[in-house]
């Protein structure tokens, strides 16, 4: 029951998972400047625990100012196209396989634990052979499937990510550290390069264009872990608190809009139009319809407080002042 609400393309999804806050246009603009302080950010927190931190992106590092805001989050070692990443950057989209193979030696022999962040790109639209190098590369693997060309093209791009992950797992296993590695995998948004009809070709059930189009998955993997399915609803703002809990990192839960998915807190998903889903009901802000066993006004008040908190923490650089005190 993990949802990835669409907020202003990739950067909105990335913002949620890296900060534990709700995005909007003004906060994303401020965040991209790289001027905010994030003493409780992902890389900063793990560095304080003795980890080396790395970040990689298989596209231009200047795009969306990614090199600035990842630095603000504590990533000292960042590579991307035009920023030291040695892959073929003269194609679109670039290859996640090439990114993984070009970077694992940076950290896999580290004398310290490492925390590595990858922003993949091979699954990006458009989903046609003519405009997408990854679709063209993997087309023979999907061409005979009983789907539309757009749906097959989408699958072709995901094969690239799948094989990139295979390469990473093999490298970790060959080094003898796979069992001591945790992998967290999530999306930044639904594939908006496909129509709802094309998405439903690939879905095991019929999705609607408001709630279920955003239904996705969060995978937290360790080779020695027992499989567990978490049924409570969640979204990317919950990922950071969940990771901190799993690594026994102490944090003040009041400093994030999200919450630990493994806690007893009720799950909540908030869409960009303020529709929402909880473990006990859902609300459609477009028509005002509510269904479930919980006070909708109570949930709406919680949502407003979380949104205001998120906006203020970025707009006024709130974490900087909290840390100083």
Label each region the model flagged.
Residues 1-325:
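Solvent-exposed soluble domains appended to multi-pass membrane proteins
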